Amino acid sequence: IQIGAVAAQGLSRLMGRTRMEERYLITSGASAGLAAAFNAPLAGTMFALEELHRNFSGAVLLPTMASAISATIVSQFFFGSATSFSFPLLVHLPSEYLWCVALIAVSCGFAGIVFNYGLLHMDAFYGLPVFRSQYMKIMFALFAATILAFTLPDVLGGGNLLVDSLAKARYGFGFLAALLLAKFLFTLISYGCGVPGGFFLPLLVIGALIGSLEGELLI
């Protein structure tokens, strides 16, 4: 997302576009970046419209959708049509379990509130005297990653393999809870230390862990 947006901004300034046109290009670039990364043009379009422009005008929708579709075509041409997650064939969910879906949605909503709160307050945490140097912030994140590499290695990385494994195997409630807590905190730590990165994919993993946790608890 960031690479696509920055590339679009650079192209805009190279071509001498106006500020308004540059905003449209940045939105289109971000949409193309997400669409290419996940082979998901619709997700890229909706993300850019909701997060960057917060409106659905045709002037924004058409270039954003065009860039997302074009990026997906190019990505599939070079890397194939495999998606980020490879779920097995799923059976239809019985209607008597629909309340579980609603409960998962509510739980993810509350988790999002807590995550946003933590994200906004990471500056206060990294503002402690011990983190006065930027290197200390990065060292703390690396130390946390090292601990997790020996204790919960599934938490590290993008999380694609973890989500795939959740769909194919069953884990105990305690292990899932540990994975969720570790992924939640480590995402905040790694993003807050200032190293360039994102939390879009980690949020998908957190949502999958919440669903697996409640599925293990309720079903």
What is the role of each PLM region?
Residues 1-219:
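Alpha-helical transmembrane segments and immediately membrane-proximal extracytoplasmic
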